[in-house]
Amino acid sequence: MNPKHWGRAVWTIIFIVLSQAGLDGNIEACKRKLYTIVSTLPCPACRRHATIAIEDNNVMSSDDLNYIYYFFIRLFNNLASDPKYAIDVSKVKPL
């Protein structure tokens, strides 16, 4: 399934989950939710790419919410179809 049909919605959910963890401090629940989201993406190639990126960057073993947050920002920016959609990291405040 083409990410242009569901991509923005999924990215919104990912960043909502991260923001919620910033409020409640439950990083383990956040990581479980994020892994569930990524491992059930409707595009097999997207699912594989995101899962490999998470594993290669030790996201699931990190206890630093901002490391996880900025990882997903970088992943988003790497996958943005148009540079105008990229997130300017210099304007992002830590959680």
Swiss-Prot record:
Main EC class the enzyme belongs to: oxidoreductase
Catalytic activity field: 2 R'C(R)SH + O2 = R'C(R)S-S(R)CR' + H2O2
Pfam families: Pox_E10
PROSITE patterns registered for this protein in UniProt: ERV_ALR
GO cellular component: host cell cytoplasm; membrane; viral envelope; virion membrane
Entry EC number(s): 1.8.3.2
Occurrences of domain ERV/ALR sulfhydryl oxidase (ranges): 1-95
One GO MF term: thiol oxidase activity
Keyword Lipid metabolism: no
Residue stretches spanning the membrane: 9-25
Requisite cofactors: FAD
Ranges of the Intravirion topological domain: 1-8
InterPro entries in alphabetical order: ERV/ALR_sulphydryl_oxid_sf, ERV/ALR_sulphydryl_oxidase, Sulphydryl_Oase_FAD-link_ERV1
Disulphides: C43-C46
Presence of keyword tRNA-binding: no
Annotated compartments: Virion membrane; Host cytoplasm
Membrane topology (Virion surface): 26-95
Induction or repression: Expressed in the early phase of the viral replicative cycle.
Key words of the record: Disulfide bond, FAD, Flavoprotein, Host cytoplasm, Late protein, Membrane, Oxidoreductase, Redox-active center, Transmembrane, Transmembrane helix, Viral envelope protein, Virion
Family membership noted in the UniProt record: Belongs to the orthopoxvirus OPG072 family.
Subunit annotation: Interacts with OPG128; this interaction involves formation of a transient disulfide-bonded intermediate, allowing disulfide bond transfer.
Function: FAD-dependent sulfhydryl oxidase that catalyzes disulfide bond formation. The complete pathway for formation of disulfide bonds in intracellular virion membrane proteins sequentially involves thiol-disulfide transfer between OPG072, OPG128 and OPG088.
The protein, known as: Probable FAD-linked sulfhydryl oxidase OPG072
Organism, scientific name: Vaccinia virus (strain Copenhagen) (VACV)
Gene that encodes the chain: OPG072
